[in-house]
Amino acid sequence: MQVVKIPNETIKFKYGTVDKHAVVFQDTIVYTGSEPQCNRFVHYMDGSSAEEILERAK
């Protein structure tokens, strides 16, 4: 899994605006959010099967 920045897209939170990121697994975006949210997703899904990870993309 790889966390990549989505160019020209941001997310607005109550404390400010941050860049939007995505988690890419086997050429599929499985999660989008802020960089810390994406890193947390990668951490929690570490060790999961490919089917479980790709199920999150639906």
What positions do the PLM features span?
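A short, charged, amphipathic alpha-helix used as a generic interaction element across diverse proteins
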Residues: 24-25, 31-57
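Local beta-strand/beta-hairpin segments that build beta-sheet-rich folds
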Residues: 4, 29-30
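Short N-terminal "domain-start" leader segments
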Residues: 1-22, 46, 50-56
